[in-house]
């Protein structure tokens, strides 16, 4: 019986959390991307999810393609929010 509980605990720890509907949070985008067949009005498609749906991000999200922060002349208040 203890072996069964151990197996269930390991199985639950390995599985990704279940989210209702067909939305899956895309972890590599800082938990900000949602996989959808089509994005809402205030969202922009960015890359694709594993299930070939668009990864939708809020329109105010700024993504750096180069992987390094760009040096701009913007003041701190005018910068876009950073993804963790």
From Swiss-Prot:
This protein's UniProt keywords = Antibiotic, Antimicrobial, Defensin, Disulfide bond, Secreted, Signal
Q: Which organism is it from?
A: Pan troglodytes
> Its principal location?
secreted
**Protein known as:** Beta-defensin 119
Q: Name one Pfam family in it.
A: Defensin_big
Where it sits in the cell: the answer is:
Secreted
In terms of domain of life, where is this protein from? Eukaryota
Record InterPro entries? Defensin_big_dom (IPR028060)
GO-annotated cellular components: extracellular region
Q: Name one GO biological process term.
A: defense response to Gram-negative bacterium
Listed as disulfide-bonded, the cysteine pairs are 35-49, 39-56
Q: What does this protein do?
A: Has antibacterial activity.
Q: Which family, according to UniProt?
A: Belongs to the beta-defensin family.
- How far does the signal peptide extend, from start to end residue? 1-21
């Amino acid at each position: 019986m203890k072996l069964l509980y151990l197996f269930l605990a390991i199985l639950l720890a390995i599985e990704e959390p279940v989210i209702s509907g067909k939305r899956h949070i895309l972890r590599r985008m800082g938990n900000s991307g949602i996989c959808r067949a089509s994005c809402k009005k205030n969202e922009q498609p960015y890359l694709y999810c594993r299930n070939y749906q668009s990864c939708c991000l809020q329109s105010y999200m700024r993504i750096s393609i180069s992987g390094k922060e760009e040096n701009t002349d913007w003041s701190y208040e005018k910068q876009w929010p950073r993804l963790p």
